[in-house]
């Protein structure tokens, strides 16, 4: 947890809604989302992909429902997974009604393209009857014609105006279980739009940089955009959009939250870039450790530093640490203090064992605390 004054983030106050059993907004944890890319009517493939995202730590998963076959498959999908499902709906209001009946926890819609006021009323009624929340999803790439004519191009003002227009549609139907997103592929536009929206409403915000790109460029863009917003206290749920597998989006989302001290899950490795002073191959060691420790869910910090220039100092701030030494022997730190040395050949196996032992202790402590509270 953050404990230094300069690490504190003051989160924007927002109302709280429910996405199935998961709370979004208010004082609820900032949740990590992803979206499947399988054909939704391929139930086996979609469920398998969601299970991989679950293992990566996802809180909420969105699936596209472009046709009746997709919504027909939704009930089977919902029954086989352990996280709430958001149905992504565009244009076809009947798909939203079908998804609500099938057990979707949330409907991602754009009230402006669902159709007439009567159709919007039917969608809202279905959401209310089946306990669904709604996400108003505004995107710079699909703004309404009248806003493009008014502003000349997509910009933050247009995104916010679209969002507020759609929010009013739901509010006019006395429906308030909704969250809002105003996404753009341009980081400046997206951040400015979310900043403006955060000033004029208290609805929970789903943040994201849309069409961010591939694994490397998308991670960088999302980290800049989402990191800036989260640092400013803006955002109640988030998706990192990558041209990559959903579980990779989840991993990056968690890394952003961990980097800001907002949520903690798994092993956070602090490592040096390596140089000629390294006492062991830092790059290879870190790659192996990250792979072998990927199954750990308990929050543990681990420093892997190749020499004594920064190693002891970094170890002061981590649960476990290794600093490269001479003659193939390296110092191991526990809770910031020197503990013992280890030979290079055995180091990786030894560190994995230490981390797994600490994770087991944390699980035992958590179970004991839970039992004591009951």
Curated annotation (Swiss-Prot):
Residues involved in [4Fe-4S] cluster binding: 272, 275, 307, 314
Cofactor(s), by name: [4Fe-4S] cluster
Entries under Pfam families matching the protein: GcpE
Any one GO molecular-function label of the UniProt entry: 4 iron, 4 sulfur cluster binding
Keyword list, A-Z: 4Fe-4S, Iron, Iron-sulfur, Isoprene biosynthesis, Metal-binding, Oxidoreductase
EC number in record: 1.17.7.3
Catalytic activity reported: (2E)-4-hydroxy-3-methylbut-2-enyl diphosphate + oxidized [flavodoxin] + H2O + 2 H(+) = 2-C-methyl-D-erythritol 2,4-cyclic diphosphate + reduced [flavodoxin]
Stated name of the protein: 4-hydroxy-3-methylbut-2-en-1-yl diphosphate synthase (flavodoxin)
Lineage of the species this protein comes from: Bacteria, Pseudomonadati, Pseudomonadota, Alphaproteobacteria, Acetobacterales
């Amino acid at each position: 947890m953050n404990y230094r004054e300069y690490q504190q983030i003051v989160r924007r106050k927002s109302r709280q809604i429910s996405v199935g059993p998961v709370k979004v907004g208010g004082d609820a944890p900032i949740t990590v989302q992803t979206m499947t890319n399988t054909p939704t009517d391929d139930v086996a493939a979609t469920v398998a992909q969601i299970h991989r995202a679950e293992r990566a730590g996802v809180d909420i998963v969105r699936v596209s429902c472009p046709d009746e076959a997709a919504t027909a498959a939704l009930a089977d999908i919902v029954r086989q997974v352990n996280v709430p499902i958001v149905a992504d709906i565009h244009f076809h209001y009947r798909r939203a009604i079908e998804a609500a009946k099938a057990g979707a926890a949330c409907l991602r819609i754009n009230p402006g393209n669902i159709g007439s006021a009567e159709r919007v009323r039917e969608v809202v009624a279905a959401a209310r009857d089946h306990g669904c929340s709604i996400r108003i999803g505004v995107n710079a790439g699909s703004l309404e014609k009248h806003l493009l004519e008014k502003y000349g191009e997509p910009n933050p003002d247009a995104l916010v105006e679209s969002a507020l227009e759609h929010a009013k549609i739901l509010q006019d139907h006395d429906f308030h279980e909704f969250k809002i997103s105003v996404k753009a592929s341009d980081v400046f536009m997206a951040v400015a739009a979310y900043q403006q929206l955060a000033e004029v409403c208290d609805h929970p915000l789903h943040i994201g940089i849309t069409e961010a790109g591939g694994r490397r460029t998308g991670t960088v863009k999302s980290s800049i955009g989402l990191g800036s917003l989260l640092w400013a206290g803006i955002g109640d749920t988030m998706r990192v959009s990558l041209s990559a597998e959903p579980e990779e989006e989840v991993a990056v989302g968690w890394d952003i939250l961990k980097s800001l001290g907002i949520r903690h899950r798994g092993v956070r490795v602090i490592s040096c870039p390596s140089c000629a002073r390294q006492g062991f191959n830092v790059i290879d060691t870190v790659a192996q450790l990250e792979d072998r420790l990927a199954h750990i869910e308990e929050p543990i910090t681990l420093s892997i530093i190749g020499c004594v220039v920064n190693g002891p100092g970094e170890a002061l701030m981590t649960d476990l640490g290794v600093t490269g030494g001479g003659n193939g022997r390296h110092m191991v730190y526990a809770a910031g203090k020197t503990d013992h040395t280890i030979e290079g050949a055995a180091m990786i196996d030894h560190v994995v064992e230490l981390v797994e032992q600490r994770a087991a202790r944390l699980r035992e402590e958590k179970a004991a605390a839970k039992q004591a509270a009951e």
